[in-house]
């Protein structure tokens, strides 16, 4: 290798068989439609979109455009994507059985996995409809009191359609 290009020369391989490698960092962010936001304090058993303290919340999927380096939407408008979502109990550090956070998007409500403060290992698939700017509007309801964190991940598929070891996180 003299010019930074890796080529396999064993067997019957040819240089034309080398796959191109493209890196495009990606992730999720929770926004108010325009800016990343910290989700405000909520009242137990009340939807996040209901007053008092109502917030318009979105999960935005973004990636780096490999040509410009700018952040762009990762999913086209109108895409329905199964995103893995979870909650993490921070204070208290363990979750109460049967008191799951539920996520609502496009009139579909899905209870999501609860995880202790020690770490997030369980997720639930949530169908999300992404609109303009790769944003999925959502509301959530937590039927208990305490401090929680929300997590999102999406397995980035291989070009051939199979699962990869890489996840978009947020």
Where are these regions (language model features)?
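Core sequence-specific DNA-binding domains of diverse transcription factors
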Residues: 1-170
